[in-house]
């Protein structure tokens, strides 16, 4: 059965109705899931297995049957571990139907159908009793309901319900306990992901400073956690202000509460500085004694950095304090962690909340609009002084005193730079209510509300009256649009340029004047694991899961690239970067496709995991901004990526299986095509084997 789905096209800006298979969302969810990453997490799997064996033994030693409840079973892996460890029966709960169906097949293939019952329900819908899903309560509770924030996937409500309705009192739990840790730091880099810094502009009239509005300065920021691969942040980018502080623990073997709570820890700052950011992670203890532990600690806080397990399904958290606070070495303070049923947040106080009688605040919510429009990388991009200087220098070469400037980018400060550099008149298109409100606040804070005209409408609806009857002599864009996911989605700027063509005057300048698509073939240190088949996991056959992921990828995404912030995922280039498509913004979008095909020579030995693609914007003939590689790869091929943008990764499925030989490919052939009607870029890459690679 086919269904029609309406989608906004991020490149063309139009709404399209697409005919999709009725299960297309299932395929997409499976293809983009972390199932493969979890199966490759050797440390996690081994620790769970050890904890399950110990829990089953404790129940058996009491002379009881071991009845297991496995919530969020996924592949059924943990249930199969339990049965192998001696459990008498397992009830494996999985709410996602395609996953539950796969679990049934995996359990059957491994010969456990008589001892594992897969229940396709949410755990809160499971019933107990003679006619229920479970005839009686379980005495062992196994779960893997955790995300990077620990509680963000609803672990607390699920545990709370399970203890009340599904498991016996004093049951065994695997994991037994979780502890959340925090460390206070000062970091201009991470703080730049949350606040707008002043921007200094040298003009013919002296220095001008663009400042953030007071609402933005006071705003607590976005409520969502910032989860990153913290080990990829250079130690030079932050100063540690406190020891690692255990903030709170949850004992999963007892009744759990999902009610809001706060936990404070007194500490003495190690050095004086500005408290801006809380780094946080957690560990889980699989047994009551805490001998079997799985930790998310970053390298500097890990008991054995050499044994650090890479994983992408659990990372580390960055929390931003509502305001930066000065701290003095040795002067005691309280770090306070708050949580509700799904979120954690932090504050810094002079005394503990219990002593000062304060009621803990509600979850922080953005009230300045900026955190609704700009995500964390976008804040970092706007605060990047080198990038801003590059735009300023480019603007100086194209501006004239009588220029009429039209700026097209979501929530961009380019219009303010253009005004300060001396153009006659500036218009900016902000076609969303959020961007319109934010830019209005920023203009007002800088006394520019009557200097820059905001047009709140779609570009194709622009009229001469909106431009006060004037022709545009300078069309500006970064470009940046909030709807963009893949690098080339910002080609929406080209479609806007085409839509406003009638409003451009003779000899109008477009900046950037062009863009180009670039590619490099890489070997990832770890990211390949998220798309790699597992085969066997801790002795269990999970090929069915591999096949399901492959079918989901083949359904849509096997010929598509996916966005990843590659500064978090180290890789080495195996080829030189290569330009494969160009887009001339000085001309409207063409009617015919832009096609390219060719060969990429591999110049370094390694396993070719995929091709990385990114855009470069040519502001002028002499100035280019890259959203991908920032400099040529070093001798070893190590890549340095733009930290404010996601790059596109096209995985080569044939090289993702770690059991396959590295191969002897020396070239990669490609076919890439830009389709003007849809704005899509289709691509295909093929590894070509050589008789003798010399590797």
UniProtKB/Swiss-Prot annotation:
Modification Omega-N-methylarginine, positions: 32
Keywords attached to this entry: Chromatin regulator, Cytoplasm, Differentiation, Methylation, Methyltransferase, Nucleus, Repeat, S-adenosyl-L-methionine, Transcription, Transcription regulation, Transferase
PROSITE patterns, alphabetized: SAM_MT_PRMT
Gene3D superfamilies in the record: Hnrnp arginine n-methyltransferase1, Vaccinia Virus protein VP39
Quaternary state and interactors: Homodimer and heterodimer. Interacts with CTCFL, PRMT5 and SNRPD3.
Similarity comment text for this entry: Belongs to the class I-like SAM-binding methyltransferase superfamily. Protein arginine N-methyltransferase family. PRMT7 subfamily.
The name this protein goes by in its record: Protein arginine N-methyltransferase 7
Species lineage: Eukaryota, Metazoa, Chordata, Craniata, Vertebrata
């Amino acid at each position: 059965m086919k269904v029609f789905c309406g989608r906004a096209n991020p490149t063309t800006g139009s709404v399209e109705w697409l005919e999709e298979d009725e299960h297309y969302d299932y395929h997409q969810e499976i293809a983009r899931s972390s199932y493969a990453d979890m199966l490759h997490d050797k440390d996690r799997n081994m620790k769970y297995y050890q904890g399950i064996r110990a829990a089953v033994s404790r129940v058996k030693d009491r002379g009881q049957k071991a009845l297991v409840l496995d919530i969020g079973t996924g592949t059924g892996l943990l249930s199969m571990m339990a049965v192998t460890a001696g459990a008498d029966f397992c009830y494996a709960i999985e709410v996602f139907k395609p996953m539950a169906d796969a679990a049934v097949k995996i359990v059957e293939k491994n010969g456990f159908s008589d001892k594992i019952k897969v229940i396709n329900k949410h755990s809160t819908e499971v019933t107990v009793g003679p006619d229920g899903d479970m005839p009686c309560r379980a005495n062992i509770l196994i779960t893997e309901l955790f995300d990077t924030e620990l509680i963000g996937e609803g672990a607390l409500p699920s545990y709370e319900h399970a203890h009340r309705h599904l498991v016996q009192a004093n049951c065994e739990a695997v994991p037994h306990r979780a502890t959340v840790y925090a460390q206070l730091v000062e970091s201009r880099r991470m703080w730049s992901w949350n606040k707008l810094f002043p921007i200094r502009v040298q003009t013919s009239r002296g220095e001008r400073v663009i400042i953030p509005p007071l609402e933005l300065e006071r705003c607590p920021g976005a409520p969502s956690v910032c989860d990153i691969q913290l080990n990829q942040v250079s130690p030079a980018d932050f100063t540690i202000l406190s020891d690692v502080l255990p903030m709170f623990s949850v004992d999963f073997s007892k009744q759990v509460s999902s009610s809001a709570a706060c936990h404070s820890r007194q500490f003495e700052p190690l050095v004086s500085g500005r408290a801006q950011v809380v780094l946080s992670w957690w560990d889980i203890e699989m047994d009551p004694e805490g001998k079997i532990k799985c930790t998310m600690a970053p390298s500097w806080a890990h008991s054995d950095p050499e044994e650090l397990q890479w994983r992408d399904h659990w990372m580390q958290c960055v929390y931003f304090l509502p305001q930066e606070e000065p701290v003095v070495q040795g002067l005691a303070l309280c770090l306070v962690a708050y949580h509700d049923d799904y979120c954690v947040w932090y504050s810094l106080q002079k005394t503990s909340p219990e002593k000062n009688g304060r009621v803990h605040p509600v979850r922080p919510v953005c009230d300045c609009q900026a955190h609704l429009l700009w995500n964390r990388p976008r804040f970092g991009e706007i605060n990047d002084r080198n990038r801003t200087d590059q735009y300023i220098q480019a603007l100086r070469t194209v501006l004239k005193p009588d220029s009429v400037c039209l700026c097209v980018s979501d929530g961009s400060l380019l219009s303010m730079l253009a005004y300060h550099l001396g153009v006659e008149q500036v218009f900016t298109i902000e076609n969303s209510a959020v961007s319109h409100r934010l830019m209005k606040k920023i203009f007002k804070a800088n006394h520019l509300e009557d200097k820059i005209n905001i047009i709140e409408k779609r570009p194709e609806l622009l009229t001469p009256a909106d431009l006060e009857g004037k022709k545009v002599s300078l069309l500006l864009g970064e470009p940046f649009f909030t709807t963009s996911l893949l690098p080339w989605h910002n080609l929406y700027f080209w479609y806007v340029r085409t839509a406003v063509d009638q409003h451009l005057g003779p000899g109008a300048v477009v900046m950037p004047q062009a863009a180009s698509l670039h590619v490099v073939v890489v070997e990832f240190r770890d990211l390949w694991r998220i798309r790699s088949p597992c085969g066997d996991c801790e002795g269990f056959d999970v090929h069915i899961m591999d096949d399901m992921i492959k079918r989901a990828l083949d359904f849509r995404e096997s010929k598509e690239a996916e966005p990843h912030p590659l500064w978090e995922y180290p890789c080495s280039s195996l080829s030189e970067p290569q330009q494969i498509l160009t887009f001339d913004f000085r001309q409207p979008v063409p009617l015919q496709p832009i096609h390219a095909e060719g060969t990429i020579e591999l110049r370094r030995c390694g396993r070719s995991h995929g091709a990385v693609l990114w855009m470069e914007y040519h502001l002028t003939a002499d100035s280019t901004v890259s959203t991908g590689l920032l400099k040529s790869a070093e001798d070893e091929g190590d890549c340095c990526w733009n930290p404010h943008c996601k790059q596109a990764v096209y995985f080569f499925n044939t090289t993702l299986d770690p059991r396959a030989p590295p191969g002897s490919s020396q070239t990669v052939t490609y076919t890439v095509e830009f389709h003007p009607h849809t704005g899509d870029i289709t691509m295909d890459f093929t590894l070509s084997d050589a008789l003798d690679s010399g590797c």
